Amino acid sequence: SDVYKRQLILGLNDGGLSYWVACIRECFEEVGILLATKKSGEKLNLEDEDKSKFDQYRKMLINNEINILDVCKEEDLILSTSNIAPLSHWITPEFETRRYDTRFFIAYLPEKQIVQHDGMELTKSLWINPNMALKKALDGEMQMILPTTENLKSCMEFKSAMDMLDNQKKISNNEIKPILPKFFKDNGNWIVLFPGDEGYEDH
């Protein structure tokens, strides 16, 4: 089934669909983009008179007054994974007190929807290509954590967002391996090693 395929792509035998649903929910909560279609097959238009209604749904989601499935039932929507693909799987280094096991996805922006950050989890947003974003990080103009810079590096080889989405959709089952970075000091400098790097297993 399609559900089972979505799980296997993430290397999971059970519970994998929840990651895809969480991705869609987070996109809607944090940037106002709802990756869904009407049951009739019609695409969502959040630039028209429906915008204020869906803005209210978004506020209620953020306040935990409803969940994403409530929105689907109320508006006869089907959550869509057609413009989403898994990108990477990161695990927080062991020395951190707060640790996460996080899946990253890429999503292609649907037509007739406007990006608007929520002002809480995301306080600023802009359109920028990966090369320029990495340059700004290197120059100290943008602060980025390691998973962000590495995810951006993986975007650089593609000519367009759709090229990258098409490539990621071809990923076979369990192809995305978890990345648990390891850090150590060498002559006073911090060194980071990734799985597969020489010396990784020694630290």
Which residue stretches match the model-derived regions?
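A generic secondary-structure signal for well-formed alpha-helical elements
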Residues: 31-39, 159
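Short helix/loop capping segments that flank catalytic or ligand/cofactor-binding pockets
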Residues: 95, 114-116, 202
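Short, small-residue-biased leader/transition segments that mark boundaries at the very start
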Residues: 3-4
